Amino acid sequence: MIAHLDGPHPDLSPDSADPGQIWALLDKLASSPAPPPYTTAVAGTPSGAARLHGWAELLTAPPGDLDPGIRDRLHELAELEATWPGLAHGDRIVHGDLRADNMVRDHHRGVTFVDWAHATTGPACIDAASLAPQLILAGHTPQKIARLLDEHPATATDPRATTAFLAALTGHWHRNARKPAPSGAPGLRAYQHRVATAGTALLTLRMNN
């Protein structure tokens, strides 16, 4: 679908009403299987989420700057992310790259997800769990977002898949953050470190429950 949207990117901060709209939209998208036209359209686009990983590689040579609490759990994290590929399949709509800059708060439509270059199908938890670290970076506490994931239908329906996906996602961020900076994107690795830290704080809360 092509449409003209008039508005800014949403505000993910705790004082904004935008996160509530986003979670309501995620609930709507994940509440039922993807319609046949969507499934047909994305049939040739395999989910990149199933290939997310990082902890197993970090386990072979733990980085010196890795938090000691995480270093002590590398075996557990590697085992957890190894379960994700077997859980990565599903029949729900998956945006695949959900961040504030891939959304527009249209003055008439409200929050709308845009840039569906990675659209595919998969379990309901992917987009909601991907968004969770972004909300922590925007100022929400890990404890608040952990409760939200415990309660939201997209992630509460299959908590095992949600935790395994978060493990794979945060491992991916930690691994990539330690690669050489690519030319033309000087702030990328610093951003990846921040989102890795946010995601790991959330993952640790889930693992400790």
Stretches with model-predicted labels:
Residues 1, 25, 98-100, 105, ...:
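Hydrophobic alpha-helical membrane segments, chiefly transmembrane helices and signal peptide h-regions
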Residues 1-39:
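ATP-binding pocket architecture of kinase catalytic cores
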Residues 19-22, 70, 74, 192:
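Hydrophobic packing residues in well-ordered alpha-helices of helical domains and bundles
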Residues 29-37, 84, 139, 177-181:
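A general structural signal marking secondary-structure boundaries and capping sites
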Residues 34-95:
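An alpha-helical support segment within catalytic cores of ATP-dependent transferases
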Residues 79-126:
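Active-site acidic catalytic loop and adjacent metal/ATP-binding pocket
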Residues 125-156, 166-183:
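Active-site activation/catalytic loop segments of kinase-like enzymes and analogous catalytic loops
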Residues 193-209:
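Regulatory N- and C-terminal appendages and interdomain linkers associated
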